[in-house]
Amino acid sequence: MKIDIREAISSKLPKASRWIPGFVYRWLARLIRQDELNRVLCENRGKTGSAFAEGALHTLGVSVSVMGEENIPASGRFVFVSNHPLGGLDGIGLIAFLGKRYGDDHLRFLVNDVLMAVKPLDNVFLPINKYGSQSRESMRAVDAAYAGDFQIGTFPAGLCSREGRDGRVRDLEWKKSFVAKSVETHRDVIPVYFSGLNSRFFYKFAKFRKKLGIKFNIELILLPGEMVKNRGSKFEIRVGKPIPWTTFTSARRSGEWAEIVKDKVYDMADEQ
């Protein structure tokens, strides 16, 4: 597998791509750090799933320490829910951690369907359409995963964290589906906090896009480059105690429960 931004655009927009000047392709290649990403792919050729995730972290010189793994029960089916600070390395770090613990055959991670293009990880991915109607086939696959014996990993925000008006970097609203599914399939929820930040430029760009009234999150194109910018970094995963599925009663709406779990995850950042 090799990343080629010109080829990717040509396959998606064959007519429009003919009119895009060569310097634009070269600029985009530099923006997403195409050469450095291809180095990660090259050095981990032949690896898939958690083995690829571990290899990618090693190539980038990234270390991820885990605290609280003892909070995970020895048996059971769980939904691991995490904040989404980075939009790349956090997912890779969690796949490396959970894949090592459970094995790739017993892990499925809910992701934006565009990430299915990352072939070395598609064996643990469960695609969700974030920008269109969810196909019946995709919905059935998600339902089957929850009903089965897989451990499920998800970033309920769907998008990586943004900077708020108060200057704090936090996830946007958490989607309620993990609450409904945990109740439906009797799965306890395990809260996970992942440390880390993207660059100041990323957050400023996101704010500027919003000021312009552009709804589509065009800053997504910056995320591959953000991953490379974080090379050599040290991150931390904090695992909390399971939240029984019976906690999510009708006393509150599923959306309210989702925000309560989200607050719990951020509280874990300050726990010693």
Segments the model singles out, each with a brief description of its role:
Residues 58, 103, 229-233:
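A short, structural micro-pattern
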Residues 71, 114-116, 132, 196, ...:
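Residue-level detector of flexible, active-site-proximal loop/helix-junction positions
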Residues 62-69, 110-113, 136-142:
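Short, charged beta->alpha transition segments
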Residues 55, 93-100, 144, 180, ...:
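Residue-level signal for well-ordered alpha-helical scaffold segments within enzymatic catalytic domains
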Residues 1-78, 89-93, 104, 122:
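Membrane-anchoring hydrophobic helices of lipid-metabolizing enzymes
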Residues 35-36, 78-133:
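Catalytic core of membrane glycerolipid acyltransferases/transacylases, capturing the structured
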